[in-house]
């Protein structure tokens, strides 16, 4: 069977296979030969896409981060109005993906790769900003308020990935989401009071 040409192969497909390989075997077991076996490509094709093994690890990790962020944040965004469901289901989603998330943490904290991975930080910041702005428009809260809550959401999730304290994580999620709910209620109350004041001024009241 003919080896697929590098130009005929979608790089996203390659990155997905490389990331799955990292999750299955760990950083120490990465080799071009094993990557060839996993992707079904020859060494020449691998080097067409990547300069070396380290670039494979970094690019595959970036792919993994992006895909997992999208999966998790899309779910959170879809169910943001249902706090009890989010607090119940989101930890399950994290637990189902814990091995992949731990690989990302390992690469991000590795002395060999952390500086290089920081080059991708603008991409991740953009993603968090994008979700914060979408959520701001959906629930009519200021972007700055939402952005802080998104950062807290991400922070407690990373803490859970490292420690795997699911009870603590659920409590922290409830706290962050309740803060979001209270901010929404406060905003609605302020808007209602403002509307009532405007109505009083426009209609007038006999003294």
Which positions does each model-derived feature cover?
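N-terminal intrinsically disordered/low-complexity leader segments
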Residues: 1-9, 192-207
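Recognition helices and adjacent regulatory flanks at domain boundaries
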Residues: 7, 19, 33-35, 50, ...
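Helix-turn-helix
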Residues: 13, 17, 21-55, 59
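Hydrophobic alpha-helical connector segments
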Residues: 59, 72-98, 149-150
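Short, basic, alpha-helical segments at the C-terminal edge of helix-turn-helix-like DNA-binding modules
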Residues: 62-69
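Amphipathic alpha-helical packing segments from all-alpha helical-bundle domains
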Residues: 74, 99, 113-148, 174-178
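Amphipathic C-terminal alpha-helical segment
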Residues: 96, 106, 140, 144-171, ...
């Amino acid at each position: 069977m003919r080896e697929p040409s590098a130009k005929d192969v979608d790089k996203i497909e390659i990155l997905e296979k490389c990331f799955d390989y990292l999750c299955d075997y760990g950083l120490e077991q990465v080799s071009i030969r094993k990557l060839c076996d996993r992707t079904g490509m020859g060494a020449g094709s691998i080097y067409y896409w990547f300069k070396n093994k380290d670039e494979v690890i970094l690019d595959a990790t970036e792919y993994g981060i992006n895909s997992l962020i999208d999966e998790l944040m899309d779910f959170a965004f879809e169910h943001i109005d249902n706090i009890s469901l989010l607090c119940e289901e989101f930890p399950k989603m994290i637990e189902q993906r814990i091995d992949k998330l731990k690989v990302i943490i390992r690469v991000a904290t590795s002395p060999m790769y952390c500086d290089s991975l920081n080059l991708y930080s603008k991409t991740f910041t953009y993603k968090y900003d994008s979700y914060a702005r979408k959520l701001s428009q959906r629930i009519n809260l200021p972007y700055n308020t939402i952005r802080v809550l998104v950062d807290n959401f991400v922070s407690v999730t990373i803490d859970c990935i490292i420690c795997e304290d699911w009870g603590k994580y659920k409590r922290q999620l409830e706290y962050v989401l309740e803060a979001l709910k209270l901010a929404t209620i406060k905003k609605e109350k302020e808007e209602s009071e403002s509307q009532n004041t405007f109505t009083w001024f426009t209609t007038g009241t006999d003294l």
